[in-house]
C-alpha cells in the first residue's frame, strides 16, 4: 500500500505500508509548462509499487508527469512499470578530431552572424520553429520566441541558399573547445554536408567539441554520426500522460 504526503517546499514524502521510503520533489519548467517535473529520491525502486505510486501523483498533480535522468535498467523497469514511456534519449558528445568516423569533406560555404544582426535573427526564427517541431511530441515548447532566443549563444554559423539560411548551428566557446549548442535545418537531405563543414571549421579553432544530441532531432543525429565513439548510456526523458 502506497501513500504520499505533501510536505511543502515542492516535496511529497512516500510511504509503503507505513514505512518512509523517501521523497519525490516536484518542479515546473516555464519553457515546457504542460508537464510537472519529478525528481526521485526513494530508497527503493520496486516495480511492483510503481503503478500505484505514479497513479496517485498523476491524480494529485493533474498534469502529465516528466522525469529526466541517466537511464539504468533498474530505473527503466521502475518507470515503465508505472506507466511512463521513454520519449527521448539524449547523447552527450565530447569529441576530438581523432574520433571522426570518416574524413571530413568541407563542401559548403559557412557564414557567421552575431547576435543583433539580421541574419542571426533569421536563424533564430528558424531554430524556434525547428526546436518546437522536434520537441512537440515529447514536451511542447511553451515560451515565446523572444524568451527562447534570449539564452542562445551569440554566434550562429549557417549555410545559405540564395539569401536564405538553410542549415545553422549556434555555437560558443566552452572550457575545452567549442560547444555546438543547437543545430537545425530546412533540408535534411543536405544537412550532412553542412555538418561536415561545420565540424571541420570548428576543429581549425579548437581541439575538442561538445554537443547534446537528442534522438528526436534528425539534424543532431546526423551530426553525431560523423563520429565513431562509444557512448555509455544516455540522459533520457520519460513521460506519463
Task: Specify the residue positions occupied by each region the protein language model found.
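Acyl-donor-binding surface of acyltransferase catalytic domains
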Residues: 45-108, 198-200, 208-241
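Conserved N-terminal entry element of GNAT/NAT acetyltransferase domains
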Residues: 1-6, 96-117
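Conserved donor-binding loop and adjoining core beta-sheet/short helix segment
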Residues: 1-56, 162-190
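Short glycine-aromatic motifs
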Residues: 2-4, 8-9, 83-86, 153-156, ...
Amino acid at each position: 500500500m502506497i501513500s504520499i504526503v505533501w510536505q511543502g517546499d515542492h516535496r511529497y514524502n512516500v510511504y509503503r505500508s507505513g514505512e518512509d521510503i523517501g521523497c519525490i520533489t516536484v518542479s515546473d519548467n516555464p519553457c515546457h509548462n504542460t508537464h510537472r517535473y519529478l525528481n526521485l529520491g526513494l530508497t527503493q525502486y520496486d516495480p511492483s509499487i510503481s503503478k500505484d505510486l505514479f497513479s496517485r501523483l498523476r491524480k494529485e498533480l493533474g498534469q502529465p508527469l516528466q522525469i529526466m535522468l541517466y537511464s539504468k535498467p533498474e530505473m527503466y523497469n521502475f518507470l515503465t512499470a508505472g506507466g511512463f514511456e521513454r520519449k527521448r534519449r539524449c547523447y552527450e558528445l565530447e569529441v576530438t578530431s581523432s574520433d571522426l568516423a570518416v574524413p571530413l569533406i568541407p563542401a559548403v560555404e559557412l557564414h557567421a552572424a552575431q547576435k543583433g544582426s539580421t541574419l542571426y535573427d533569421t536563424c533564430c526564427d528558424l531554430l524556434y520553429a525547428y526546436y518546437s517541431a522536434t520537441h512537440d511530441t515529447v514536451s511542447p515548447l511553451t515560451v515565446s520566441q523572444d524568451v527562447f532566443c534570449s539564452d542562445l549563444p551569440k554566434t550562429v554559423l549557417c549555410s545559405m541558399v540564395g539569401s536564405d539560411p538553410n542549415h545553422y548551428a549556434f555555437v560558443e566557446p566552452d572550457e575545452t573547445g567549442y560547444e555546438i549548442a543547437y543545430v537545425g535545418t530546412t533540408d535534411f537531405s543536405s544537412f550532412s554536408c553542412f555538418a561536415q563543414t561545420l565540424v571541420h571549421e570548428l576543429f581549425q579553432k579548437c581541439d575538442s567539441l561538445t554537443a547534446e544530441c537528442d534522438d528526436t532531432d534528425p539534424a543532431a543525429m546526423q551530426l553525431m554520426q560523423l563520429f565513431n565513439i562509444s557512448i555509455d548510456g544516455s540522459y533520457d526523458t520519460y513521460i506519463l500522460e
